[in-house]
Regions:
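Sec/Tat-exported extracytoplasmic proteins
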Residues: 23-26, 30, 67-68
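Periplasmic OmpA-like peptidoglycan-binding domain that tethers envelope proteins to the cell wall
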Residues: 10-16, 37-112
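Acidic/histidine-rich, surface-exposed loop or edge segments in extracytoplasmic proteins
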Residues: 1-5
Length: 112
């Protein structure tokens, strides 16, 4: 999970480690695909948050492509706005946990 500041689509430096893990797994298992899912807190209008969440997802997806060499055909990005919260948005801590991108990797591991 990659967290974001309020009203920002900029990836924080501390997210590098998480991106390395995702990219490493996808390189080790080249048949995998991933959904990059962007989310927001409930500050702002639903329409604005939908666009912000999409920008966050696009930013993470583009970083996986350009910095880590993951093929674009293996990735898709979707913004969910504030529709899939992890916590209630009634506190600063709750809102912080909802400002995130999740990368869901789909794969089938075959035992030899």
């Amino acid at each position: 999970m990659i967290d974001f500041d309020t009203d920002s689509d900029q990836i924080k430096a501390k997210a590098e480690e998480q991106m390395v893990i995702v990219a490493g797994f996808m390189k080790e298992y080249p048949e995998t695909t991933a959904l990059v899912a962007g989310h927001t807190d409930d500050v702002g209008s639903p329409a604005y948050n939908m666009k912000l969440s999409q920008r966050r997802a696009d930013c993470v997806m583009n970083t996986l492509i350009t910095k880590f060499g993951i093929a674009k055909s293996r990735l898709s990005a979707k913004g969910y706005g504030d529709t899939r919260r992890l916590e209630y948005n009634t506190s600063a801590e709750g809102r912080k946990k909802n400002r995130r991108v999740e990368v869901w990797v789909d794969c089938v591991l075959v035992k030899n």
